[in-house]
From Swiss-Prot:
Protein name in UniProt: Aspartate--tRNA ligase
UniProt enzyme class: ligase
Residue positions binding ATP: 217-219, 226, 482, 534-537
Gene Ontology terms for molecular function: aspartate-tRNA ligase activity; ATP binding; nucleic acid binding
Ligand binding (L-aspartate): 171, 217, 448, 489
Length: 590
């Protein structure tokens, strides 16, 4: 039906007859002449209708926005005075000779001036996706997946599909369950990840596996989360953690250069302990220059109990953030930051303004200065490298509260004061995570997942001291987003059972949930490691949006609903009866 795409025409096509298919983006009547901007997935071109072409001209008078049309005409150069440098096709136009109105459009339910709510855009997603901004994001997504497949194929990886209907296993979030009609009362689970299947593929000898795969998690949603999302899933045999990181870093560096034209350089590697201490986050945004600085040793003997008590407590922390130029903040602004850290459990936000660094105690302004002597002030100013015009913000309390509160404050200050370099890329690897963390009920839970191997520990040593275990795990972080994470896996039966026991999974439950895995580990399992990238997050970063729904063709809302199809919906009674399911309505009090 067509010879060319609208957005691909240029001066090299001058004089050629072309047939185009697409939509009316805009129509203009100018002094008896009709111009339209015609749009397809590749872009927009101007089409000119001359009254001398009577049939086409009379039809063009009927055109309205979003009519689906086909035109045949000749490409010609625009006069110099009419060249539009803001359009990729701005040097040419198409002189229309025939017009076919394929389909008419009713007035759009979306406003072309972009004043639509997100709910409207999701309800009429098929119209919203016609916008070049949205279409370009999905085209970039396609380029990214195409690049990943080429890279992985060239590295000798095999693209192998794993099941969508599988067994529920504890991976940190709720499962989406699918009832079985054949096996009454039993349910499949949609996979939260292909984790166990890709490990089984390594046990099967496939050595290098990858898959671009849908995953499902029934969890509370945020701007960067969806109930169904896409992973670039990778697993290898006989490779160390360092080798996996090296290969995956190479892929991401080449991807960024391909899509954005940027060389990310080599990624720094930091431990979990270091990033939590310096940045208050396990996914730090390194574009932000602010850091947390520990000062407990400097204030442990002061007569200010807010500092002295946590400074002398092994579970306490006193830390400070130096904000360049922050002395200009008003008391009202400082009070607002105090309320902000309260969200994270902080009981207040002490501060010191540095007016004259060389004057020491006499050169600072602070409600707490009266509790601190000249030696302490000098120590604080020296350790933080404070300069005239800076402000110091303090956190004091438990390690968790101080780390969380100052970590969040660091990000907020970076945005509010334009300290974060938004036009740059700052990737890193985070390694050496704790293997377990407190579950809040006196037990332990796996920080990553229960199939992660510890670093340099036997099963007996792990069982004896699980709290000190370091996981052989690694996360890739770019600009404050965790874009990928992985680990070296457990490949010995006794180690896997030891981990299960630490997590409170008894022998019977181990067999019920993971019997197939424990059996497989008995038959010559190779050492293996892997990683998974969040494709949606990668696309989000590379297209410059902060909302993951912008890079998914048909996303769900934060309530996990599809406004377009009205999913989820009620099942008809006959289907429920066939599945032996009865729906029990919740009482209002519940």
């Amino acid at each position: 039906m067509r010879t060319d795409y609208c957005g691909q025409l240029n001066l090299t096509h001058e004089g050629q007859k072309v047939t185009l298919c697409g939509w009316v983006n805009r129509r203009r009547d100018l002094g008896g002449l009709i111009f339209i901007d015609m749009r397809d997935r590749e872009g927009i071109v101007q089409v000119f209708f001359d009254p001398d072409q009577q049939a086409a001209f009379s039809q063009a008078a009927e055109l309205r926005n979003e009519f689906c049309i086909q035109i045949t005409g000749t490409v010609r150069a625009r006069p110099d005075s009419q060249i539009n440098k803001d359009m990729a096709t701005g040097e040419i136009e198409v002189f229309a000779e025939s017009l076919n109105i394929i389909n008419r459009s009713e007035p759009l339910p979306l406003d072309s001036n972009q004043t639509n709510s997100e709910e409207q855009r999701l309800k009429y997603r098929y119209i919203d996706l016609r916008r070049p901004e949205m279409a370009n994001r999905l085209k970039t997504r396609a380029k990214i997946t195409s690049f990943v497949r080429r890279f992985m194929d060239n590295q000798g990886f095999l693209d192998i599909e794993t099941p969508m209907l599988t067994k529920a296993t504890p991976e940190g979030a709720r499962d989406y369950l699918v009832p079985s009609r054949v096996h009454k009362g039993k349910f499949y689970a949609l996979p939260q990840s292909p984790q166990l299947f890709k490990q089984l593929l390594m046990m099967s000898g496939f050595d290098r596996y990858y898959q671009i795969v849908k995953c499902f998690r029934d969890e509370d949603l945020r701007a960067d989360r969806q109930p169904e999302f896409t992973q670039i899933d990778v697993e290898t045999s006989f490779m160390t953690a360092e080798q996996v990181r090296e290969m995956m870093e190479k892929m991401i560096r080449e991807l960024w250069f391909e899509i954005d034209g940027v060389d990310l350089g080599h990624f720094p590697v930091m431990t979990f302990a270091e990033v939590m201490r310096r940045f208050g986050s396990d996914k730090p945004d390194l574009r932000n220059p602010l850091e947390l600085v520990d000062v407990a040793d400097l204030v442990k003997d002061v007569e200010f109990s807010v500092f002295a008590e946590p400074a002398n407590d092994s579970k306490g922390r006193v830390a400070v953030i130096r904000v360049p130029g922050g002395a200009e903040l008003s008391r009202k602004q400082i009070d607002e930051y105090g309320k902000f850290v309260g969200i994270y459990g902080a009981k207040g936000l002490a501060w010191i303004k540095v007016n004259a660094r060389a004057a020491g105690l006499e050169g600072v302004q602070s409600p707490i200065a009266k509790f601190l002597n000249a030696e302490v002030i000098e120590g604080l100013l020296s350790r933080t490298d404070a300069q005239d015009g800076d402000i110091l913000f303090f956190g004091a309390g438990s390690v968790k509260v101080v780390t969380d509160a100052l970590g969040a404050l660091r990000l907020k200050l970076g945005r509010d004061l334009n300290l974060t370099k938004l036009d740059s890329w700052r990737p890193l690897w985070v390694i050496d995570f704790p293997m377990f963390e407190d579950d809040g009920e006196g037990g332990l839970t796996a920080m990553h997942h229960p199939f992660t191997s510890p670093c340099n520990m036997s099963a007996a040593e792990l069982a004896q001291d699980p709290v000190s275990a370091i996981a052989n795990a690694y996360d890739m972080v770019i600009n404050g987003y965790e874009v990928g994470g992985g680990s070296v896996r457990i490949h010995r039966n006794e180690m896997q059972q030891a981990v299960f026991r630490i997590l409170g999974i008894n022998e019977q439950e181990q067999q019920e949930k993971f019997g197939f895995l424990l059996d497989a580990l008995k038959f010559g399992t190779p050492p293996h490691a892997g990683l998974a990238f969040g494709l949606d997050r990668l696309v989000m970063l590379l297209t410059g949006t902060d909302n993951i729904r912008d890079v998914i063709a048909f996303p769900k809302t934060t309530a996990a609903a599809c406004l377009m199809t009205e999913a989820p919906s009620y099942a008809n009674p006959a289907s429920l009866e066939e599945l032996s399911i009865s729906v029990v309505a919740k009482k209002e009090s519940e």
